[in-house]
């Protein structure tokens, strides 16, 4: 059996996910967080993405894709607001709730899947 080594950071060097929030759903760990862009003049300018790994293999992470585009929020149709520090919860109804803060506005947003 080939051994893999875990590194810190565990995501690829091109991926910047500060404020990471890990959650176990089923047999996978999902990491949600703000999404920075290399060389950008501000933080949290990208849409939200998610990475996951099997709870049995935290060395092999998979890109789950974009989970929420900042322009999807009705208060941010132009995409001018930055979204900070997201977190996810699974509701009793089985749906997933993505909570996020708008930059410097004192408001929270929620998206439901």
Task: Label each residue range with its predicted role.
Residues 1-113:
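Carbohydrate-active catalytic/glycan-binding domains of CAZyme proteins
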